[in-house]
Amino acid sequence: MSRRRKICVVTGSRAEYGLLFWILKAIESVKDLELQLVVTGMHLSNEFGMTYRQIEADGFSIAHKVDMLLSCDSAAGVTKSTGIGMIGFADAYELLTPDIVLMLGDRFELLAAASAALFAGFPIAHIHGGEVTLGSMDETIRHVLTKMSHFHFVAAEEYRTRVMQLGEDPT
């Protein structure tokens, strides 16, 4: 009997969790896969409603929580939060030893998650690479995540082309 493949999914906001919901359900429905859900960012913030509770109410087990948000959204605050996140994700991945880390989007929490996965040698799958958010730091983070990722799930041919322009193979 082969062992179950561990799929670590990172979620940091209610908006991106909504997009991940059916993917999480699909992973759980496959007997050869083990969902390892890691919550971080706004999900763990009083200011944003502690939305990890909704994830639990939806029936998902949370494998690990990475509390990384400081109460400051200045450049220094975001930078420090990212550093705290890298430490937390390093601990999470050491404990969980995933076969792959799946993430969606372009938020700075994912930069911490991807950096820790990259250093630990865990492959990264990124959903929604190649998209554009003009005038936003999120676009740069999305492109960095695309470069760090081993597997790419894009939403349109235009985004597939952009992923290829970044030197990646979106197949």
Language-model regions, residue ranges each:
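Active-site-proximal region of nucleotide-activated glycan assembly enzymes
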Residues: 122-171
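Short, well-structured alpha-helical segments in soluble
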Residues: 84-97
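N-terminal phosphate-binding or glycine-rich loops at protein starts, especially the Walker A/P-loop
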Residues: 2-41
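Structural motif
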Residues: 6, 99-100
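An aromatic- and histidine-rich active-site surface loop
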Residues: 102-119
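Helix N-cap/beta->alpha junction signal
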Residues: 13, 106, 156-158
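Conserved nucleotide-sugar phosphate-binding/catalytic loop shared by glycosyltransferases and other
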Residues: 33-81, 88
